[in-house]
């Protein structure tokens, strides 16, 4: 199952830092790119079936550390 989420940050530099950090996450079929603008980052990955997948929790925690949040 595929999951996608978009985050928004107060500045382009925070979004860029998030994007570059997430690129190195260990997640199946991970795709990370800028979203609607340079303050938005879109993340898409395949949810691991049959086991607990903490990817979304890790994304949320990292976004929070960089003053970002899930985009509405």
Predicted regions and their residues:
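Acidic/polar low-complexity segments and flexible, solvent-exposed patches
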Residues: 1-72
